[in-house]
Amino acid sequence: RLVGSEMCIRDRYLAGGMSTEQFYGIDAFQKNILNGIGTIAFPLFCLLLSEGFFYTKNRKRYIGGMLAFALISEVPFDIGFFSRYSIAEGTFPFYLQYQNVFFTLFLGLLTLVIIEKVALKISGDGRKSKVTKILCQLGVVIIMAIIAELVKCDYGSQGIVYVSMLYFLRKSRLLQSAGFLIMYMVTTGNQPTIFIVVAALIILLYNGKRGNLSIKYFFYWFYPVHISLLYGASLLFK
């Protein structure tokens, strides 16, 4: 997805005597591997996001941090994926046609906040109260999913659905894993790939224990930094 790098790499390999068929065979394999890594990583981010929301001691700070990294990551994201960053191109200060995944996760957190507020406002153990609560919470998920699509976040409504589903089913890893597979098929219309199955297995095996909090921000910073490094590497082929 790094604009321009594919053409430069292609020209280099073709000049070395590789056939077009050979190049695109390798290129497709590389793309599948990279896409596969992202396919595994995103649902795991959604899982950890929902877990973090449940266990964090300061939700405002948690949500604020997600928004901060969404803003920090947007410039590297715009430059790395669209290769243009100027007022003339309409990409300054942000390219509004597509937003990075931190915005998706931020909206996912807001969804969970509203879902919990709805649960607190609609009290009662009766059947009517439970049905009303579920319908209202489902309505919140749908509205936030629509917003994610309108804002044009990476993964869009799919991200909101994943975060919400994993939060609702957090008491059972088996239900989370099965729910993820079902939601993947519902939101994409595709059969699960090997990468989706791997992600589902990792969700199933997750023990729920908190990891080393000292490296938490390493993973936050990794996203904008690795995009910048990949874009810089793509310039070497020009």
Residue ranges, per PLM feature:
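Short, small-residue-biased leader/transition segments that mark boundaries at the very start
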Residues: 2-9
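Juxtamembrane/transmembrane-helix boundary motifs at the membrane-water interface
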Residues: 10-40, 75-100, 144-149, 212-216, ...
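Transmembrane alpha-helical segments and their boundary/interface "anchor" motifs
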Residues: 35-44, 53-109, 126-133
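Short hydrophobic alpha-helices at membrane interfaces in multi-pass membrane enzymes
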Residues: 127-143, 176-182
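Functional transmembrane helices that form membrane-embedded active or gating regions
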Residues: 131-135, 201, 205-232
